[in-house]
Amino acid sequence: MNCTLKIIGKGDSVGNNEWIGIDNAHQNNLKNISVKIPKHQLTVFTGVSGSGKSTLVFDTLVAQSRRELNDTFSSYVQHILPKYGRPAVDNITNLPIAIPIEQRKMSGNVRSTVGTYTEIYTFLRLLFSRIGQPFVGYSDAFSFNHPQGKCEVCDGLGFTKKINLKYLVDFNQSLNEDPIDFPTFGNGAWRWKRYAHSGLFDLNKKIKDYSKEELDLLLYAPQQKLASPPEKWPKTALYEGLLPRIKRSIINTDEGKRHRKQLEKFVSTDICPTCQGSRLNAKALSCKIDGHNISDLVAMSLDELQLLIQKIRNSLVQDVKTQINKRLDALITIGLGYLNLARSTDTLSGGEAQRIRIAKHVTSSLNDVMYVLDEPSSGLHPKDIERLYKCLRVLKDQGNTIILVEHNPLLIQRADYIIDVGPGPGVNGGSIQFSGTYGEFLKSDTITSVAMRENERLNNHTNSSFKKWLSVRDKNLNTVQNVSLKMPLNALTILCGVAGSGKSSLAQIVASELIQKGIDVINISQKNIGISLRSTPLTYLDIFDDIRKLFAKANSVSPSLFSYNSKGACPRCKGKGVIVNDMYFMDDVVSECELCHGQRYNQKVLQYDYKDKTIVDILSMTVSQAVDFFSGITRIATGLQAICDVGLGYLKLNQSLSTLSGGELQRIKLSSYLQKKSSVYIIDEPTNGLHLKDIDHLLELFDRLVARGNTIVIIEHSLKVIRQADWLIEMGPEGGKMGGKVVFSGTIDDLKKSNDAITKPYL
């Protein structure tokens, strides 16, 4: 059904352009939803995981706004912009321009830093060019991306890559014997041919027997035209030695990212010995303000930098100071004062990246736009959530509409308007359960409102409850200095504290101590688990082969017929279910395959069934549905039940892991360990993206693991989880250099009696 926009008149029921109207939305699992959203207010969409919140907000509201905006550009510009499919909705009215601020990591560009992204570094360059002594040039002289300012040794990167030849080249082999240990240089590969077909080398001669001239040509020669190229040599090709070719075309490129593990075998990264990581040349570093060069300033925490900038008294830079302070204020207010401007953006967490984007918009001149945020509280301590809320209020007070997809009770309580989607996940969701104010919400009987009204019981364990302990004495790591503490074993210990306070560093210290004592440790972080478009919950848990064998046996055919990576693949998308369009300098655009409609398989596969279900029917099931379907097959049912146990029963069996959040990926990883024997689990924020009701299931799982004699150490901010801790360790008092200290260690009962001012007030 076509989506149309109608102009609202003054007397229309939506009224005075103050409400966004959605009429009959039926995208994905949405059940013909019609709802109104107040403009210039802070609205929270909540509901259990998989209920349809993101579909309604991002796939319907944001998608239509971006489509309409893109249609206003010329045909040429539209051609290079991302394409947004027409959302399944009858009508949307009073729709502002949408700016989505998602929880995704920033660009992997090694030249992008917190300073360059926020433009603070741009203004620091202006500052030094105007009042720095001695004068060394204008702002370009302080840019590590400009020939005038960058260190020539590291090319403005701050680090150098060194290739260890003994791990890359086997000198005991000839070129015909595959001596180069990198995939695209293998025997017969196109890069191998650049050496084999150059006419410069005897292909059967051992490399160790090469003359110095031959070895230099093979390894170090710069790009050059061949004087007398052989017949097989491409006419336009340039010859280049192995090391410069790898440095130029593989290291720090997309190909290098794909072969990261292979590169790690022979490439080491070291701080540049010339600029010591500052990225700048000696001339730029010689210019100082009050004894500090520009590298000193970018290495300071944002809190320290603001104090230094405020001390500068010079009318020549008053306008520059104003711009710097405005941006620093926004970042510090949102709780990122522990960062420094030198921090590479690709090392930021998804939550940190999102908050930097929010801070950037706080200083924007735009207004009357719709900011849409996906779980902005993720990874934040309640104290940091208060800081986040202040920034969201500033955005709202500037005349903007704020929409959050959120589970956190602290932000739900502070919303001007709440829309609850549910009641359940997947096919059991997709309906509006409630819309109204927070006071009205608490009187409703939705799953979310009931969970928020529940009085949480506090864990009443005492020190005498624990029999075994781990002691840590005088340990240092990153911001954690000289830390000493004790922690109970066979218990649930929570590490909490504001962002950047040293929780992750302390977890590493604890893991190291346990390993030294011969105790097995399973570390479950939110880092990438090696996913691709082809990865699904079934492939990750290694139970898809069992399902394919069931189909093969029932139909007397090969199991490979039921693999979308083999004979069963759709010929158009090659089993991916989607078509990926490379947008070069922008994010890839992913669209559903028009031939298989996202099913991944060719039509021949659909002729076969198992218990009256095709392979596509089964892969379209949720994990919870599949547990019942395979209840008689222990290996399959046990693996699927483990996914349900971590609160992910709503996932589809064929859902690409690349579409999951960091928290969901982590819980998939956790589910794969549940059947293994261990004594200690260290888990990083497992409640990310979880509804309050789903957290209950996770706590039950942790209780079972502890009851089996395991120790669980969790880095966590959820008050629901903190209240159930057997032991609590709080780091702080702030982030960065102001953190790294144990400010509290003990039971919840001990915390209630303490004078703690960080976590206690929120319990």
Give names to the regions the model predicted.
Residues G115, D420-R453, E730-Y762:
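Conserved beta-strand-loop-alpha-helix hinge in the C-terminal portion
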Residues H381-K390, L692-E700:
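Conserved D-loop/post-Walker B switch-helix segment of ABC ATPase nucleotide-binding domains
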